[in-house]
């Protein structure tokens, strides 16, 4: 029998990971803290992200623990793309097996995305109050149960309901992973770690559709959900044994729902934070319009097999991961984050313009290869946009990392859930709606970035 991990006496909190040297004392309006425990806290070894004596961020900390935590957090942030992308090659099969049109089958994808959005809004404040581990483990157990229920769903209505539950539960992984990063890191160290996290979690969208396509060789779409439930079980066992508590009891918020809402209202009142939140959300909408439309565009319009679609999706995801690593390993610390973010938006926007021209027939009949190149450029730009939008927003919110992470994730997935059905409004035989949604979303992201963040001005 597998050992579920170390047991702790009832009177003691979960093990606490060493924190950054200090936190700003200012909280969001209305936020309250639990009273500090009496007596001095024992000094631990330097934590990742602490300022080195020379003034730069110290990224390594305890190397072995840092690598292990990176893998765990990467696995947690990979859960949403796994839940969404591994299912993509099966969408046409779901449509046929349950005797529903493509637009109805796409609603099962939208339901999961909506659950991921709303779930983060709930779990984020809970993690600020109860710590990171308990809400995470509760959500992961519910994710496993929902995955099994999806595998045995008798109708598209039942499948849609349990996909919603699966998204609600899976939200715990991504929102708490971001909050843990904010607990451990600050400044440029956080931006670099987010890019490293993108490398780990970026493997998920690369491998998920390929794995999903291979699963369909041996079983039907129901087998995909059983594998997702098994992945959830593996993550639960790893978290139980290896993920420490990163939010000490004396730094937790003591208020209830009203306090959480006041904290979020204070965050949204910050113009610059709101700008990064909106820019990142609409950039994500452009990305997810590709995720929602590409199975039908590639397989129905261009006649490709599920395996060919999976390979094309993998190539595009590699572009996302590669540019994310370029951001974290080369650009961060050398080029201002706002400049990189702006370039990423411009790069994706130019690709969206080209895609709209190709799909609308301006260049005549365009084959699959030019379309795939345009999508790859668009996805690569996201590798520069998404980590920097999240980093810049979280740098302004050291006092409420869970709530800020929840707002970021909820906004991104909610806007994505609204945008995804729009790609199918003109039916299954045209890719114009996909390109139009992508271009519109990126224009709105750029307007929010320029109008609210005002990157040319000095910040408070």
Language-model features, listed with the residues they occupy:
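Juxtamembrane intracellular "pre-TM" segments in multi-pass secondary transporters
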Residues: 54-62, 244-277
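Helix-breaking motifs and short loop linkers at transmembrane-helix boundaries and internal kinks
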Residues: 97-99, 131, 152-158, 169, ...
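Helix-to-loop junctions at the C-terminal end of transmembrane segments
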Residues: 120-131, 323-338
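Structural signature of the two symmetry-related core transmembrane helices
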Residues: 134-149, 339-355
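Cytoplasmic helix-loop-helix junction between adjacent transmembrane helices
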Residues: 162-201
